[in-house]
């Protein structure tokens, strides 16, 4: 399986393997194992916390539910858990805008530009069915390169 196949399926379905917005944290760790604990996202609070499985990053709220899903794609290689990647889980990074939009089109996954996250050195698009975001860096004199893919939160607020 290729990285774009995984990201396109994630954008189309709103999930990456066992992970989706609202998934119970115990279900995630049962399926993927223990993650790297990056730390807290709050001010002087224990929750919410950011956890990582390679380049898959998950924000988890106080009630232990997945609040946000991010896949960092700006590195030379992108690492995902083998169980969600359908194999080794290591892929070439630095994916072009043209390749992403082509893959979304081939998968019949409609998208639209996201003007709120588009400015001088960055552009972004949103998949209409899931709200998944693809944000690109625009290097000077070069084509846009995929920086991050995210699944947006559902508005849940447990104060943590």
Which residues fall in each region the model found?
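Short helix/turn-capping signatures at newly exposed starts of structured segments
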Residues: 1-160
């Amino acid at each position: 399986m290729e990285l774009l196949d995984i990201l396109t399926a994630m954008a189309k379905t709103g999930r990456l393997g066992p992970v989706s917005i609202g998934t119970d944290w115990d279900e995630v760790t049962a399926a993927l194992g223990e993650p790297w604990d990056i730390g807290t996202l709050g001010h002087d609070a224990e929750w919410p916390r950011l956890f990582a499985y390679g380049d898959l990053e998950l924000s988890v709220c106080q009630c232990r539910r997945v609040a946000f899903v991010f896949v960092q794609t700006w590195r030379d290689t992108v690492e995902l858990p083998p169980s969600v990647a359908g194999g080794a889980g290591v892929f070439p990074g630095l994916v072009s805008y043209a390749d992403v939009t082509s893959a979304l089109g081939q998968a019949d996954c409609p998208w639209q530009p996201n003007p709120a996250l588009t400015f001088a050195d960055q552009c972004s698009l949103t998949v209409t069915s899931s709200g998944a975001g693809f944000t690109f860096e625009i290097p000077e004199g070069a084509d846009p390169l995929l920086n991050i893919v995210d699944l947006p939160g559902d508005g849940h607020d447990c104060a943590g």
